[in-house]
Amino acid sequence: MSEIADKVKKIVVEHLGVEESKVTPEASFIDDLGADSLDTVELVMAFEEAFSVEIPEDAAEKIATVKDAIDYIEKQKAA
């Protein structure tokens, strides 16, 4: 697992209070991890701060799973 993936996983565990084992790439923040819309906004803000990236609202709406977040951040960091 990449450094970005590890950090995303840690942020999700801290913000949603879920077990680390439940935070898989395919896990949906809302359906699998019990997040609500406010939680997802807070996660996006945490990702922006932790990785020094900007995630516009239209992109944030498409980030539904752990893998979506990792992929988006990796693309931004590579740009």
UniProtKB/Swiss-Prot annotation:
Keywords: Cytoplasm, Fatty acid biosynthesis, Fatty acid metabolism, Lipid biosynthesis, Lipid metabolism, Phosphopantetheine, Phosphoprotein. GO terms for molecular function: acyl binding; acyl carrier activity. Residues 2-77 form the Carrier domain. The modification O-(pantetheine 4'-phosphoryl)serine is found at S37. GO terms for cellular component: cytosol; membrane. One of its GO terms (biological process) is lipid A biosynthetic process. Pathway: Lipid metabolism; fatty acid biosynthesis. InterPro entries: ACP, ACP-like_sf, PP-bd_ACP, Ppantetheine_attach_site. Its main location: cytoplasm. It is found in: Cytoplasm. 4'-phosphopantetheine is transferred from CoA to a specific serine of apo-ACP by AcpS. This modification is essential for activity because fatty acids are bound in thioester linkage to the sulfhydryl of the prosthetic group. PANTHER family: ACYL CARRIER PROTEIN, CARRIER DOMAIN-CONTAINING PROTEIN. Carrier of the growing fatty acid chain in fatty acid biosynthesis. Belongs to the acyl carrier protein (ACP) family. This is Acyl carrier protein. The lineage of its organism: Bacteria, Pseudomonadati, Pseudomonadota, Alphaproteobacteria, Acetobacterales.
